[in-house]
């Protein structure tokens, strides 16, 4: 018989840096999950992606066991890394803060493909380009 799901927790945590402090502790503690077990497992799975924020979906079962799925980093984080900037523009329609090439956008779209609701890489690219536009990043050919 399948285990009964009692909770679904979604968090965005720095790769390899999960600890029992907020936001992880309180979110999992209210479901009775062993927080240290989650932190160790999450840090082990994400240690090679240091510096990125990795979203995670934790499914909590009736017997207090859990499983989790790590997603790809948000497009905005990948765009900031590609453009070497710390934050997007405060006024994206007026102030442009950086440029990213089409090839970089394609790489990001291919990375994000499994988490995006897109049928093709081109559709995923247009989603990433939209995120870039809303951050004040211009897309250049190349």
Curated annotation (Swiss-Prot):
InterPro entries (UniProt xref): Ribosomal_uL11, Ribosomal_uL11_bac-typ, Ribosomal_uL11_C, Ribosomal_uL11_C_sf, Ribosomal_uL11_N, Ribosomal_uL11_N_sf
PTM field: One or more lysine residues are methylated.
Q: Name one GO biological process term.
A: translation
Q: Which GO terms describe its molecular function?
A: large ribosomal subunit rRNA binding; structural constituent of ribosome
What's one Pfam family here? Ribosomal_L11_N
Which Gene3D superfamilies does this UniProt record tie to the protein?
Ribosomal protein L11, C-terminal domain (1.10.10.250), Ribosomal protein L11/L12, N-terminal domain (3.30.1550.10)
UniProt keyword list: Methylation, Ribonucleoprotein, Ribosomal protein, RNA-binding, rRNA-binding
A GO CC term?
A: cytosolic large ribosomal subunit
Functional note: Forms part of the ribosomal stalk which helps the ribosome interact with GTP-bound translation factors.
* PANTHER family in UniProt: 60S RIBOSOMAL PROTEIN L12, LARGE RIBOSOMAL SUBUNIT PROTEIN UL11M
Protein name, per record: Large ribosomal subunit protein uL11
Q: Which gene encodes it?
A: rplK
């Amino acid at each position: 018989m399948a285990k009964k799901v009692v909770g679904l927790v979604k968090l965005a945590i720095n790769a390899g840096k999960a600890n029992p402090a907020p936001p992880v502790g309180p979110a999992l503690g209210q479901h009775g999950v062993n927080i240290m077990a989650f932190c160790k497992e999450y840090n082990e799975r994400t240690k090679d992606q240091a510096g990125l924020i990795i979203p995670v979906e934790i499914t909590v079962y009736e017997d207090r066991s859990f499983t989790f799925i790590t997603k790809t980093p948000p497009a905005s984080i990948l765009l900031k890394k590609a453009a070497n900037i710390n934050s997007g523009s405060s006024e994206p329609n007026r102030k442009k803060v950086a440029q990213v090439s089409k090839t970089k956008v394609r790489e990001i779209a291919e990375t994000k493909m499994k988490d995006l609701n897109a049928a093709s890489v081109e559709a995923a690219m247009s989603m990433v380009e939209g995120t870039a536009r809303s951050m004040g990043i211009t897309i250049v050919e190349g």
